[in-house]
Amino acid sequence: MKIVRTVHEWQQLQKSFQGKSLGFVPTMGALHEGHMALVQNSVSDNDVTVVSIFVNPTQFNNPDDLENYPSTFEQDVSNLNDWKVDVLFFPEANELYPDNFAFSVDENKDSLALCGLDRPGHFKGVLTVVMKLLNIIQATRAYFGEKDYQQYRLIQNMVACFFMPTEIVGVPTRRDREGLALSSRNLRLSPEELTTARKVNKILSSETLSAEVRREKIENLGLKIDYLEERWGRRFIAAHIGSVRIIDNVSLGEEETIK
């Protein structure tokens, strides 16, 4: 696996991949089996797979979240090699933001709901960095997990609206044996908090509970709910367990077409 740090270095390397399909998996590191599922899809679908690791500072509302975001770079590199990744793009912040975030991408509809309500500016940071990465990598396909379904929806719409050629592929959420959605943030949960978090998906997925009872059961676990609602044919939750914010969603069977 080659590791490249600059846009220029990638552009030179990219010339050797002409005529080949290119899959791209953008990440912020702290890789787990959920990321592995994205990579496996890319390796299966494409001739070449590129993974980026970049902890994007512009999508964090809370400076403590940025400072405390887990970093496991050496293990990440080992995993990427095991997963048969061809290239790791690992830029510094000033490489992707030479303008110091003077230019940005805003969406004024779907980004204002759910996570957008509690994290103003978050999706501006996400969409801006993803547009930059897609323009840099010029991939045939890019892969995003459905755990972050709102993000996936926004990125797919952005790519369509700006006539970008990369196909955006959604990959179903990877979960542990007890149903907890895999997330880098899970590393920050204590054993007791993990036990609590694993109970949330069962409540979220239940079709026998009313909305009121579902909320009550989750609050009785000690979680502080940011939102618990249904839209786009899915049921969404964001809640705090201690200092850690977790999100999840489940399909209700008839999902609204992304457009």
Question: Where on the chain are the PLM-derived regions?
Answer:
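Nucleotidyltransferase catalytic core that binds NTPs
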Residues: K2-E216, N220, R231, S243
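Phosphate/ribose-recognition catalytic cores of enzymes acting on nucleotide-derived substrates
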Residues: K217-K259
